[in-house]
Amino acid sequence: MPSASDHTRAPPAKSSDDLAGLSVLLVEDSAAVGEAVKQLLELLGASVSGPAATTAAAESLLDQRLPDVALLDFHLRGGERSDGLIAQLRQQGVPVILLSGSFEFPTPSSLAGTTILEKPVSEAQLLAHLGPLKPRRW
């Protein structure tokens, strides 16, 4: 019978600067998921504010710094949704990408055209969607 040690594991992610210069607001109510996404973003060179578990915590972070992009969980604890925060970010010109554990929820019309990534999100997905948003340095 094979043991767990017999299975090949993927090598740990190496630090890179693929997203260097990109500031990201991360809103995720699961501490474990939030920390995992934050670590991956930082390994890719992004500067991360959060993870914020509530929209109030996210708004507090926005008072300190306007990000280049926001990664948001739509359904937060206690029935809280992030659509009000999404509207606020869009008014300020901040692109929004949703992270969802399920595509089984009805999508409000206010989210039309919004990129939705299913969790767990991969390094390749983050690079594909965040890379083009990286500030240009001349």
Please report, for each region that a protein language model flagged, where it lies by residue.
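Non-catalytic signal-transmission and effector/linker regions of two-component phosphorelay proteins
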Residues: M1-S23, A56, T115, S122-W138
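His-Asp phosphorelay/catalytic-motif detector in bacterial-type signaling
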Residues: G21, L66, S82, R90-V96
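Conserved acidic carboxylate
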Residues: E28
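Two-component/phosphorelay signaling modules centered on CheY-like receiver
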Residues: A31-G50
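Acidic, metal-coordinating helix/loop segments flanking the phosphotransfer/catalytic sites
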Residues: P51-V69, R77
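Conserved phosphotransfer microenvironments
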Residues: L72-R90
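Hydrophobic/aromatic residues positioned on beta-strands within the core alpha/beta folds
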Residues: L99-S100
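As written
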Residues: S110-L117
